[in-house]
Amino acid sequence: MSLLTILLDGTAAAGGAIGAGFAAMGAGIGIGQIGKGAVEGIARQPEATNDIRANMILAAALVEGAALFAIIVGFLAMVL
């Protein structure tokens, strides 16, 4: 193997790991913001607790799904 091939393989692995890490951090921040908004909404309007909670869970699931795809792509970049 030439030095260039080794460097390119290492760079691809590092890029995949960094991308997966940023995806996980972004999902954590996004879900935190969703939870913050839900708690503020429930504090303002306690009678709408069930509706707010259902929407919060749906939004958090969508964020987690997008983050999961990003993490898988990052891991594939490391492997391939």
Model-identified regions with their sequence ranges:
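Hydrophobic, small-residue-rich transmembrane alpha-helices and their short perimembrane loops
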Residues: 1-80
